[in-house]
Design a protein with these regions (language model features):
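Short histidine-centered loop motifs in beta-beta connectors
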Residues: 50, 55, 118-127, 156-166
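P-loop NTPase catalytic core
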Residues: 217-218, 224-549
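Short, surface-exposed secondary-structure boundary micro-motifs
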Residues: 18, 32, 68-69, 87, ...
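Short, compositionally biased
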Residues: 40-45, 76-87, 143-163, 181-196
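P-loop NTPase nucleotide-binding/switch module
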Residues: 95-150, 166-226, 240-243, 278-297, ...
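C-terminal amphipathic alpha-helical interaction region
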Residues: 535-589
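N-terminal accessory targeting/assembly segments
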Residues: 1-102
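Metallocofactor- and cofactor-centric catalytic cores in central/energy metabolism, strongly enriched
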Residues: 44-46, 68, 154-157, 229-230, ...
Length: 589
């Protein structure tokens, strides 16, 4: 079915003669066959969002509808790959057209010639339903790719064969109840705007270990949770996202560079192959899918890139994997929505954003969660969605930040003053929050006993108390404080500098296990408890603050994963001995 262009306005093209087309259908526009998607229909005229540069297009050019919605190809070959916002593989396009992507380039998302070794796990005669695993492919050394029956099919398996196949070759044949035969390949297609089905959704109960102490201990996120990372320019949103992509204890990471600088994607491409996953020793790239829709690419494709990423994540979730989707930045996506809304002459909402901004943001985040996967075997997978928000001037009262805060659970507020003070991660512990603290308390209690959560609450109380005392210090100076308040200020400083602050460039400190975090915080709070006891017995405050063990606590976070337990036990022993000596010295005086 084809129509004719009657209007071109930037990325928006209006064509007539498409009365039989549907909203969300993919179309080919003009002589270069640019990729577009129908946004709305009025009679036989269609408003089309074109995902490529439209210069040179004009009225009279032909538009052809494919009759298919915007879909992604799901199968072996996605991991370690880098796609643009509409799932075109950038390495293969570079081989075809060079560094600049030619308009209308049409390359399949999955390599059609590469052969994968398919190992059947289902047997002929098995009754299968949507989501059942029929075989596996060792896609990378870190990930076993499970080939599943598409969610819409069910029936009896009448043939299956193992061996080396391309993604389009038939590996099995399924006969449904009507007697129709369906050939199954290793590849599925799925519309990006429709979430993949699952059996049931459940409450997130396991934390996602990010290796970042301020996140894991103070503001944890659960696997299957949602989080926002808002902050002004230069406060470290992308660096936080990179750290999460590197060290999170998930099986697969989908990193969406949506409208941000190309150098940030380059950093990922250069660093990830060099870094190893702390859980299995494999290069991090083996578990990563990159979607690059950088600031110099067409704005319209940003809108698709978020949906492309979350659909790929749902596919891996259906295999029973824990997946993290990192979107950097959802603000650029919202700006793409605003531009298209303006071109469509829709009624603008606050600050020119469309009135449906909040519902679109909700559609993205609600696809996160912990699910019981479809299929007869019990599989549980999760999608954790973490979106960066870039409010102009760092003003989180703007519509994108506000809509995001109403939807997501965890809020890691980045602070430019902390970033400029070289405090990384620059997450403000006074304005951030996480409702998952109560949900995950049971898990922490089972792993570490009640002391973990008690220590967390004590640390938060000390940091909040320090904030109140700083007002007095600014007015009358530190000498006006009581010895107990001086100790609170000193402990808070230790918590800030020796616990919350991390060095992303030192291997020993870039990632902290839960146990190391627990022991480090316990050591700082033990100093606080012993110090209060010593001050009550008349110990000299200056002598207390200058003990050798306190200096060793400052270096304790750099202890290696193999030796930190012995190191921390030695520091605690030294601390008790030195504080006893300070008390004895105070009593003698």
């Amino acid at each position: 079915m084809s129509g004719t262009i009657i209007k071109v306005s930037g990325p928006l093209v209006v064509a007539e003669g498409l009365g039989d087309a549907n909203v969300s259908d993919v179309v080919r526009v003009g002589p270069d066959r640019l990729i577009g998607e129908i946004l709305n229909m009025t009679g036989d005229s269609a408003s089309i969002q074109v995902y490529e540069e439209t210069s040179g297009l004009g009225p009279g050019a032909e538009v052809e509808s494919t009759g298919m919605p915007m879909s992604v190809e799901l199968g072996p070959g996605m991991l370690e790959n880098i796609y643009d916002g509409i799932q075109r593989p950038l390495p293969e396009i570079r081989e075809l057209t060079g560094a600049t992507i030619s308009r209308g380039t049409d390359v399949p998302a999955l390599n059609r010639t590469k052969k994968w070794t398919f190992v059947p796990v289902a047997h002929e005669g098995d009754e299968l339903t949507g989501g059942d695993v029929i075989g596996t492919v060792q896609e990378t050394s870190a990930i076993l790719h499970k080939i599943m029956v598409p969610p819409t099919l069910s029936g009896r398996l009448i043939s299956i064969k193992g061996g080396d196949f391309t993604v389009t070759e038939t590996v099995a044949v399924l006969e449904d109840k009507k007697g129709e035969k369906h050939e199954l390949t290793m590849m599925q297609k799925w519309p990006v705007r429709i979430s993949r089905p699952y059996a049931s959704k459940s409450m997130p109960t396991r934390p996602m270990n990010s290796g970042q102490r301020i996140i894991d201990t103070l503001f944890p996120i659960a696997k299957g949770g949602t989080a926002a990372v808002p902050g002004p320019f230069g406060s470290g949103k992308t660096v936080v996202q990179h750290q999460l992509a590197k060290w999170s204890d998930v099986d697969i990471v989908i990193y969406i560079g949506c409208g941000e600088r190309g150098n940030e994607m380059t950093d990922v491409l250069m660093e990830f192959p060099e870094l190893t996953d702390p859980r299995n020793g494999e290069p991090l790239m083996k578990r990563t899918v990159l979607i690059a829709n950088t600031s110099d690419m067409p704005v319209a494709a940003r809108e698709a890139s978020i949906y492309t990423g979350i659909t790929i994540a749902e596919y891996f979730r259906d295999m029973g994997y824990d997946v993290a989707v990192l979107a950097d930045s959802t603000s650029r996506w919202a700006e793409a929505l605003r531009e298209m809304s303006g071109r469509l002459e829709e009624m603008p909402g606050e600050e020119g954003y469309p009135a449906y901004l909040a519902s679109r943001i909700a559609q993205f985040y609600e696809r996160a969660g912990v699910v019981e996967c479809l299929g007869s075997d019990e599989r549980r997978g999760s999608v954790t969605a973490i979106g960066a928000v870039s409010p102009p001037g760092g003003d989180i009262s703007e519509p994108v930040s506000q809509a995001t805060m109403r939807i997501v659970k965890v809020f890691w507020a980045l602070d430019s003053s902390l970033a400029y003070a070289r405090h990384f991660p620059a997450i403000n512990w006074l304005t951030s929050y996480s409702p998952y603290v109560d949900t995950l308390a049971k898990w922490y209690n089972e792993q570490f006993g009640p002391e973990y959560m008690i220590n967390r609450d004590k640390a938060m109380h000390i940091l909040q108390e320090e904030n109140e005392l700083q007002e007095i210090v600014r007015l009358v100076g530190q000498d006006a404080l009581s010895p107990a308040d001086r100790l609170t200020m000193e402990t808070a400083k230790m918590l800030r500098e020796d616990f919350l602050q991390q060095n992303a460039f030192v291997d020993e400190d870039a990632y902290s296990s839960y146990d190391k975090q627990f022991e480090l915080m316990r050591m700082i709070l033990t100093f606080d408890a012993l110090g209060r006891d010593a001050l009550g017995k008349g110990a000299d405050m200056k002598a207390l603050f200058s003990i050798g063990a306190k200096e060793r606590i400052g270096r304790a976070k750099m202890a290696s994963p193999d030796s930190y337990k012995q190191e921390y036990a030695s520091i605690l022993e030294q601390m008790k001995t030195e504080i006893d000596a300070v008390i004895a010295g105070g009593e003698d005086a």
